[in-house]
Amino acid sequence: MASQQGQQTRKIPEQEKKDLDQRAAKGETVVPGGTRGKSLEAQERLAEGRSKGGQTRKDQLGTEGYKEMGKKGGQTTGDKSAGEREEEEEED
């Protein structure tokens, strides 16, 4: 993935790179997944790291576990035990 993004960057004309870098410095996201990067290069690195992190979790959990993790992402854990939540899910 890193080499792919690096190759994409090299194909961009120098003037366009400068423009993207300036926009990134102003806080604009110019690379998908590069949120909060303060330069074009920083945004590329952030996007690559986020992609690798997600892939690693998917590999560790398997496809089904990864999907299940996404479904439960918004649920709070402080109010009920896992068993109580599971019982409620079975009722629905």
From Swiss-Prot:
Pfam families: LEA_5 (PF00477). Induction: By abscisic acid (ABA), osmotic stress and heat shock. Residues 1-92 are annotated as: Disordered. Maximally expressed in dry seeds. Also present in mid-maturation embryos. Keywords: Stress response. Residues 1-10 have a biased composition (Polar residues). Residues 11-26, 38-71 have a biased composition (Basic and acidic residues). Belongs to the small hydrophilic plant seed protein family. PANTHER family: EM-LIKE PROTEIN GEA1, OS01G0159600 PROTEIN. LEA proteins are late embryonic proteins abundant in higher plant seed embryos. They may play an essential role in seed survival and in controlling water exchanges during seed desiccation and imbibition. This is 10 kDa late embryogenesis abundant protein. The lineage of its organism: Eukaryota, Viridiplantae, Streptophyta, Embryophyta, Tracheophyta.
